[in-house]
Amino acid sequence: VTTGCQRYPYDPEKATRPYPSQLAQGSLADIQVIPNINGGTLKLVNATAVSYSNFDLWMNRRYVRHVDALPAGQTVELPIDTFWDERGEGPFPGGWLRYYDPTPVILVQIQSGPDTPLVGLIAKPPDTDKR
């Protein structure tokens, strides 16, 4: 559900829980996160020998989505418009027909359990915008 006066993409039915600020980031994984502005996606490049499964992916300490699997040595692309916050607001995804600049991707973290430390990922600059 989107209306003309909304500042952000908004769907109250997609509201999630708040960012787990009580959890520390315990480690940093060699997984690059590259925004694709024209495609409105996040590319996750797992350069490690570790597979991750059944986790929540946090973006900018605000938006979250569930990810089924990120296999070792593989790349996964996720639509940015599948991330939501606790109010049911989403980031601006980009794309050719966008009205606003895409939400910058600053911090990306894996949460594998409710009480486990977060795993930080490497946020890279976006793919070149050739719009």
Regions flagged by a language model, labelled:
Residues 23-68:
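Short, surface-exposed binding/anchoring microloops in extracellular/periplasmic proteins
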Residues 2-22:
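Bacterial Sec signal peptide processing site at the extreme N-terminus
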Residues 39, 52, 73-75, 103:
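Extracytoplasmic
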Residues 13-16, 84-131:
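Terminal connector regions
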Residues 61-96:
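Intrinsically disordered, low-complexity Pro/Gly/Ser/Thr-rich segments with frequent PxxP/GP/PP motifs
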Residues 2, 33-35, 103-108:
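Generic hydrophobic, helix-prone segments enriched in Leu/Val/Ile
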Residues 41-43, 56, 77-79, 107-109:
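Beta-strand secondary-structure signal
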Residues 47-50, 71-72, 112-115:
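A short, structured loop/turn motif at beta-sheet edges
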